[in-house]
Amino acid sequence: PGWSFNSVVFKTLNGALNQGLKSFDDIDGVEELEFYFGNIDVRHHLCRLEGDPIKNTEALADRYIEQARELGAKIYELLPIENESRVVPKTGHYDGKPFWGSWAERKKVRDHFNDYIEYKYDIIRWTDYLLNDRGELDFAYMEKPRSIHLSREYYPHWTGVEKETMS
């Protein structure tokens, strides 16, 4: 109803930027464009790669901001980090591991990524209702029984949250 959704499963933000954000859909005539990428990069790469994870995060965010700005696109904040007890299917592993870095390290990277984009560009904040009392992504909002993905019924466009939180 007035919008479309293009899910690009298994695509990292880094991979999307290398390919070019404008390559993901026919955007001619699109009035409003929004992107959500980055959780795979936090889960598997930013705490694993050589160098300072925060500097690596900022470099990735700068590339994201540059391409989003060129397209006049909005950026959604990253999902919170779920508890490490979540059993992740092997398709969600990288080099045999469900994640790289501790929960606290990945949360720090995720929070910095969101804050940095908000400071340098703009970001759509929408995930507070997805948190449990420990500040983790609550399993209740994730695909069942085991997945690293948010259940579609909790996507912003399904719930109307995006219109309430846009600045």
Residue ranges and their predicted role:
Residues 1-30, 118:
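Serine-esterase "nucleophile elbow" of acetyl-processing enzymes
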Residues 21-152, 160-163:
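Alpha-helical cap/lid subdomain in secreted, periplasmic
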